[in-house]
Amino acid sequence: MNDEYELLDSGNGKKLERYGNVILERPAAQAVWAPQFPDRWEKATARFDRVGGLNWEGRNRISKPWNVDIAGVTMKLSATDFGHIGAFPETRTLWLWIRSTLKEQIRKKGRELKFLNLFAYSGGATLAAAQSGAQCCHLDASKGMVDWARENAALNHLTEAPIRWIVDDVIKFLRREVRRGNRYDGILLDPPSFGRGKKGELYKIEDQLMTTLDLVDQVLSDDPAFVILTSHTPGFSPIVLRNLLAQFHEDGIFEYGEMLLTGKPEVNELPNGNWARWINE
Protein backbone atom coordinates (compact mmCIF):
# COMPACT_ATOMS: atom_id res chain seq x y z
CA MET A 1 0.00 0.00 0.00
CA ASN A 2 1.37 3.38 -1.00
CA ASP A 3 1.96 5.99 1.68
CA GLU A 4 3.77 9.12 0.62
CA TYR A 5 3.55 10.87 4.00
CA GLU A 6 6.46 10.97 6.43
CA LEU A 7 7.32 12.96 9.56
CA LEU A 8 10.95 13.97 9.12
CA ASP A 9 11.52 15.77 12.43
CA SER A 10 9.90 17.97 15.06
CA GLY A 11 11.02 20.39 17.75
CA ASN A 12 11.16 24.05 18.81
CA GLY A 13 7.40 24.26 18.32
CA LYS A 14 7.49 23.08 14.71
CA LYS A 15 7.13 19.95 12.57
CA LEU A 16 8.87 18.96 9.34
CA GLU A 17 6.83 16.68 7.09
CA ARG A 18 7.14 15.16 3.65
CA TYR A 19 4.05 14.93 1.45
CA GLY A 20 5.22 13.20 -1.69
CA ASN A 21 8.04 15.35 -3.05
CA VAL A 22 7.02 18.42 -1.01
CA ILE A 23 8.63 19.07 2.39
CA LEU A 24 6.77 21.46 4.68
CA GLU A 25 7.73 23.20 7.92
CA ARG A 26 4.70 24.24 9.98
CA PRO A 27 3.84 25.04 13.62
CA ALA A 28 3.41 22.27 16.21
CA ALA A 29 3.11 23.86 19.64
CA GLN A 30 3.35 20.50 21.41
CA ALA A 31 6.86 19.86 20.00
CA VAL A 32 8.61 21.49 22.95
CA TRP A 33 11.81 19.44 22.58
CA ALA A 34 14.85 20.21 20.43
CA PRO A 35 14.93 18.90 16.84
CA GLN A 36 16.72 15.57 16.34
CA PHE A 37 17.96 16.24 12.82
CA PRO A 38 18.77 19.98 12.38
CA ASP A 39 20.20 19.50 8.88
CA ARG A 40 16.89 18.19 7.54
CA TRP A 41 15.12 21.51 8.08
CA GLU A 42 17.18 23.17 5.37
CA LYS A 43 15.42 20.95 2.81
CA ALA A 44 11.98 22.47 3.39
CA THR A 45 10.17 23.33 0.17
CA ALA A 46 8.02 25.89 2.00
CA ARG A 47 7.47 27.19 5.53
CA PHE A 48 4.38 28.46 7.31
CA ASP A 49 4.24 30.38 10.60
CA ARG A 50 1.81 32.49 12.59
CA VAL A 51 4.31 35.08 13.81
CA GLY A 52 2.78 38.47 13.12
CA GLY A 53 -0.04 36.89 11.12
CA LEU A 54 -0.42 33.93 8.78
CA ASN A 55 2.64 33.70 6.56
CA TRP A 56 3.96 31.28 3.94
CA GLU A 57 7.56 31.38 2.78
CA GLY A 58 8.29 29.52 -0.46
CA ARG A 59 4.63 28.89 -1.26
CA ASN A 60 5.36 29.60 -4.92
CA ARG A 61 7.67 26.56 -4.98
CA ILE A 62 4.73 24.21 -4.38
CA SER A 63 2.82 22.90 -7.37
CA LYS A 64 -0.78 23.67 -6.57
CA PRO A 65 -2.52 21.43 -6.06
CA TRP A 66 -0.57 18.20 -5.79
CA ASN A 67 -1.69 14.64 -5.07
CA VAL A 68 -0.33 12.30 -2.40
CA ASP A 69 -1.22 8.74 -1.41
CA ILE A 70 -1.87 8.42 2.34
CA ALA A 71 -2.83 5.01 3.77
CA GLY A 72 -4.07 3.85 0.38
CA VAL A 73 -6.16 6.98 -0.29
CA THR A 74 -5.10 9.53 -2.90
CA MET A 75 -5.59 13.06 -1.53
CA LYS A 76 -5.47 16.39 -3.30
CA LEU A 77 -3.34 18.81 -1.26
CA SER A 78 -3.07 22.58 -1.46
CA ALA A 79 -1.31 25.16 0.72
CA THR A 80 -4.23 27.17 2.15
CA ASP A 81 -3.98 30.66 3.63
CA PHE A 82 -4.49 29.21 7.13
CA GLY A 83 -1.62 26.73 6.86
CA HIS A 84 -3.77 23.62 6.37
CA ILE A 85 -3.16 21.53 3.28
CA GLY A 86 -6.21 19.26 3.04
CA ALA A 87 -5.15 16.21 5.06
CA PHE A 88 -4.49 15.28 8.68
CA PRO A 89 -2.16 12.26 8.44
CA GLU A 90 -2.34 11.62 12.19
CA THR A 91 -5.71 9.99 11.36
CA ARG A 92 -4.33 7.58 8.77
CA THR A 93 -4.16 4.62 11.16
CA LEU A 94 -7.88 5.15 11.77
CA TRP A 95 -8.51 5.05 8.01
CA LEU A 96 -6.73 1.72 7.83
CA TRP A 97 -8.76 0.37 10.76
CA ILE A 98 -12.07 1.62 9.32
CA ARG A 99 -11.37 0.07 5.92
CA SER A 100 -10.34 -3.34 7.29
CA THR A 101 -13.05 -3.46 9.97
CA LEU A 102 -15.89 -2.58 7.62
CA LYS A 103 -14.65 -5.08 5.04
CA GLU A 104 -14.54 -7.82 7.68
CA GLN A 105 -17.93 -6.88 9.14
CA ILE A 106 -19.56 -6.86 5.69
CA ARG A 107 -18.23 -10.38 5.15
CA LYS A 108 -19.21 -11.49 8.65
CA LYS A 109 -22.71 -10.00 8.71
CA GLY A 110 -23.46 -10.88 5.09
CA ARG A 111 -25.07 -7.53 4.35
CA GLU A 112 -24.24 -4.00 3.29
CA LEU A 113 -23.05 -1.67 6.04
CA LYS A 114 -23.63 2.06 6.25
CA PHE A 115 -20.87 4.42 7.43
CA LEU A 116 -21.41 8.01 8.60
CA ASN A 117 -18.55 10.52 8.73
CA LEU A 118 -19.37 13.70 10.69
CA PHE A 119 -17.20 16.84 10.51
CA ALA A 120 -15.71 14.92 7.61
CA TYR A 121 -13.28 17.52 6.15
CA SER A 122 -11.61 16.33 2.93
CA GLY A 123 -12.87 12.78 3.14
CA GLY A 124 -9.95 10.47 3.88
CA ALA A 125 -12.00 8.29 6.24
CA THR A 126 -15.04 8.41 3.95
CA LEU A 127 -13.01 7.14 1.01
CA ALA A 128 -11.31 4.45 3.09
CA ALA A 129 -14.79 3.27 4.11
CA ALA A 130 -16.00 3.38 0.51
CA GLN A 131 -13.01 1.25 -0.51
CA SER A 132 -14.29 -1.42 1.88
CA GLY A 133 -17.59 -1.62 0.01
CA ALA A 134 -19.67 0.24 2.62
CA GLN A 135 -22.39 2.75 1.80
CA CYS A 136 -21.16 6.12 3.04
CA CYS A 137 -22.56 9.45 4.16
CA HIS A 138 -20.07 12.34 4.27
CA LEU A 139 -21.12 15.48 6.15
CA ASP A 140 -19.35 18.79 6.64
CA ALA A 141 -20.67 22.31 7.19
CA SER A 142 -18.28 23.72 4.57
CA LYS A 143 -19.36 23.36 0.94
CA GLY A 144 -15.77 24.01 -0.09
CA MET A 145 -14.54 21.03 1.93
CA VAL A 146 -17.29 18.75 0.63
CA ASP A 147 -16.38 19.75 -2.92
CA TRP A 148 -12.73 19.00 -2.08
CA ALA A 149 -13.73 15.57 -0.75
CA ARG A 150 -15.65 14.87 -3.96
CA GLU A 151 -12.52 15.69 -5.95
CA ASN A 152 -10.66 13.19 -3.79
CA ALA A 153 -13.34 10.60 -4.56
CA ALA A 154 -12.68 11.12 -8.26
CA LEU A 155 -8.93 10.70 -7.73
CA ASN A 156 -9.68 7.33 -6.11
CA HIS A 157 -12.07 6.21 -8.87
CA LEU A 158 -14.97 6.35 -6.41
CA THR A 159 -17.20 8.79 -8.30
CA GLU A 160 -19.85 6.10 -8.70
CA ALA A 161 -19.46 4.70 -5.18
CA PRO A 162 -22.55 4.90 -2.91
CA ILE A 163 -21.57 8.10 -1.08
CA ARG A 164 -24.05 10.77 0.04
CA TRP A 165 -22.41 14.20 0.12
CA ILE A 166 -24.06 16.49 2.66
CA VAL A 167 -23.39 20.17 3.47
CA ASP A 168 -25.18 20.85 6.75
CA ASP A 169 -25.00 21.51 10.46
CA VAL A 170 -24.29 18.20 12.24
CA ILE A 171 -26.96 18.47 14.94
CA LYS A 172 -29.69 19.52 12.49
CA PHE A 173 -28.74 16.69 10.16
CA LEU A 174 -28.73 14.07 12.93
CA ARG A 175 -32.14 15.18 14.20
CA ARG A 176 -33.55 14.77 10.69
CA GLU A 177 -31.98 11.32 10.38
CA VAL A 178 -33.59 10.28 13.67
CA ARG A 179 -37.00 11.41 12.40
CA ARG A 180 -36.51 9.70 9.03
CA GLY A 181 -35.41 6.44 10.61
CA ASN A 182 -32.05 6.38 8.83
CA ARG A 183 -29.54 4.22 10.68
CA TYR A 184 -25.79 3.59 10.43
CA ASP A 185 -23.50 0.71 11.33
CA GLY A 186 -20.28 2.66 11.78
CA ILE A 187 -19.88 6.31 12.75
CA LEU A 188 -16.84 8.58 12.98
CA LEU A 189 -17.03 12.08 14.42
CA ASP A 190 -14.24 14.64 14.76
CA PRO A 191 -15.91 17.65 16.41
CA PRO A 192 -14.03 20.95 16.29
CA SER A 193 -13.22 23.01 19.35
CA PHE A 194 -15.23 25.77 17.72
CA GLY A 195 -17.06 25.85 14.42
CA ARG A 196 -20.03 27.16 12.50
CA GLY A 197 -22.72 25.33 10.58
CA LYS A 198 -23.93 25.97 7.04
CA LYS A 199 -26.12 28.87 8.19
CA GLY A 200 -23.76 30.17 10.87
CA GLU A 201 -24.90 27.83 13.64
CA LEU A 202 -22.37 27.95 16.47
CA TYR A 203 -20.72 24.68 17.55
CA LYS A 204 -18.62 24.60 20.72
CA ILE A 205 -17.38 21.17 21.72
CA GLU A 206 -17.92 21.67 25.46
CA ASP A 207 -21.54 22.73 24.90
CA GLN A 208 -22.68 20.58 21.98
CA LEU A 209 -20.73 17.32 22.20
CA MET A 210 -23.06 15.49 24.60
CA THR A 211 -26.06 16.38 22.44
CA THR A 212 -24.17 15.19 19.38
CA LEU A 213 -23.24 11.87 21.00
CA ASP A 214 -26.82 11.31 22.14
CA LEU A 215 -28.03 11.81 18.56
CA VAL A 216 -25.25 9.56 17.24
CA ASP A 217 -26.51 6.85 19.58
CA GLN A 218 -30.03 7.29 18.21
CA VAL A 219 -28.95 6.81 14.58
CA LEU A 220 -27.02 3.59 15.22
CA SER A 221 -28.45 0.44 13.65
CA ASP A 222 -29.74 -2.45 15.75
CA ASP A 223 -26.48 -4.34 15.13
CA PRO A 224 -23.80 -1.66 14.74
CA ALA A 225 -20.07 -2.19 14.31
CA PHE A 226 -18.42 0.81 15.95
CA VAL A 227 -18.36 4.47 16.93
CA ILE A 228 -15.11 6.45 16.77
CA LEU A 229 -14.66 9.82 18.50
CA THR A 230 -11.58 11.97 17.81
CA SER A 231 -10.54 15.40 19.01
CA HIS A 232 -7.77 17.94 18.63
CA THR A 233 -9.15 20.01 21.52
CA PRO A 234 -6.75 20.45 24.50
CA GLY A 235 -8.05 18.63 27.57
CA PHE A 236 -10.02 16.04 25.60
CA SER A 237 -7.60 13.22 26.39
CA PRO A 238 -8.03 9.60 25.28
CA ILE A 239 -9.59 8.75 28.65
CA VAL A 240 -12.02 11.68 28.39
CA LEU A 241 -13.11 10.51 24.93
CA ARG A 242 -13.43 6.93 26.13
CA ASN A 243 -15.54 7.99 29.12
CA LEU A 244 -17.82 10.03 26.86
CA LEU A 245 -18.48 7.00 24.65
CA ALA A 246 -18.97 4.79 27.71
CA GLN A 247 -21.97 6.89 28.78
CA PHE A 248 -23.84 5.56 25.75
CA HIS A 249 -22.48 2.00 25.53
CA GLU A 250 -22.29 -0.35 28.51
CA ASP A 251 -21.19 -3.46 26.62
CA GLY A 252 -18.55 -3.94 23.97
CA ILE A 253 -14.86 -3.10 23.74
CA PHE A 254 -13.32 0.32 24.29
CA GLU A 255 -9.99 1.28 22.75
CA TYR A 256 -8.29 4.66 22.91
CA GLY A 257 -5.02 6.45 22.36
CA GLU A 258 -3.19 9.40 20.88
CA MET A 259 -3.19 10.27 17.20
CA LEU A 260 0.42 10.38 16.07
CA LEU A 261 2.44 11.84 13.24
CA THR A 262 5.13 9.29 12.47
CA GLY A 263 8.14 8.73 10.26
CA LYS A 264 10.99 6.28 10.20
CA PRO A 265 11.70 4.38 13.48
CA GLU A 266 14.47 6.78 14.54
CA VAL A 267 12.16 9.83 14.33
CA ASN A 268 10.33 10.91 17.49
CA GLU A 269 6.57 10.44 17.19
CA LEU A 270 4.56 13.66 17.39
CA PRO A 271 1.17 13.49 19.17
CA ASN A 272 -1.53 15.49 17.42
CA GLY A 273 -4.94 14.80 18.92
CA ASN A 274 -6.65 11.85 20.57
CA TRP A 275 -9.11 9.11 19.71
CA ALA A 276 -11.39 6.56 21.32
CA ARG A 277 -13.66 3.93 19.83
CA TRP A 278 -16.42 1.62 20.95
CA ILE A 279 -16.57 -1.76 19.20
CA ASN A 280 -19.74 -3.81 19.38
CA GLU A 281 -18.56 -7.29 20.34
Predicted regions and their residues:
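Conserved SAM-binding motif I beta-strand of class I
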Residues: 135-140
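Conserved class I S-adenosyl-L-methionine
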Residues: 110-121
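A short glycine-rich, Lys/Arg-flanked "PGG" loop and its adjoining helix->strand segment in the class I
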Residues: 207-223
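Non-catalytic substrate-recognition/targeting regions of SAM-dependent transferases
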Residues: 2-20, 24-89, 96
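C-terminal catalytic and target-recognition region of SAM-dependent MTase-like enzymes
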Residues: 224-281
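Conserved SAM-binding loop of SAM-dependent methyltransferases across substrates and taxa
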Residues: 122-134
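Conserved alpha-helix/loop element of class I SAM-dependent methyltransferases that forms part
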Residues: 89-109
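S-adenosyl-L-methionine
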Residues: 142-188
